[in-house]
Amino acid sequence: MPPRPKEYGAVIFAGICFGTTGTAQALGPKGASPLVVGAARLLIGALFLCGVHRLLHTGGQRLKAADLLSGGVGVALYQLSFFSAVRSTGVAVGTLTAIGSAPALTGTIAFLITKEVPSRRWFAATMITTVGIIFLTGAKGFSHVNVLGVLEALGAGASYSLFAVASKRAMSGGASFTETMYKIFGFGAILLLPCFALGKSHFLFTGSGFLMALWLGLVPTAVAYTAYGYGLNKIKVATASTLVLAEPATATLLAAVVLGERLNAYSWLGVSIVVAGLIYLSRE
């Protein structure tokens, strides 16, 4: 069955949920360890995803060990590199670089591993949205960009791509989208358990720290990846990686509305171009 508008809409909705991540971290306790933040997000998210799987009772084949391993490693590394990038170079630049690099990286990895060939519309839409992200990034300026933070964000993009390709391969092999998500995130959470001992986790026992961890585990993880998995089950992984570029547009708007960052004409133009690219791709 070919993908329907609701599959595209589900992935775009997931991208909107992803876009709340950086703002939630910025509103959390200052100096919170990115190791612990990432580990807490995965642990809470995995528990919620397990509940979703049990609630929906979706069947399917068991995940292959290779998909579980590569997906879990990818999602674990993403948490560490993304939250470190946001702390190093800020919400906007960290988010834009991480998710902005993902479509090209995902398309390349998917072709090398699964021989999945992206469509012409994907190439065009990815170029359109990339132009939008360039405007968004340029609008923030580069005077305060941390080179290490940018490298961490690129690492997050590569880690996300590894997770996405592994998840798609698992579902193509017969695993249900709910089982794929909860098992990969569960394995990733296990990998990050040592972070609670290595990093300072006392902030989790404060009001703002607890709410931040709960939000990160519930909205941009459990809710987002349930929607993402539902859409990815029918959509090419490269297409999905471009549709989630709703994330940087959302992050930019939230940075203005919630964090008080001022948007100039370049910001609005960038958001508009990204939205146009997403609409174009969703009509595939």
What is the predicted role of each segment?
Residues 2-4, 40-43, 50-51, 209-211, ...:
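C-terminal-most transmembrane helix of multi-pass membrane proteins
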Residues 5-10, 36-51, 124-131, 148-155, ...:
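Hydrophobic alpha-helical transmembrane segments of multi-pass integral membrane proteins
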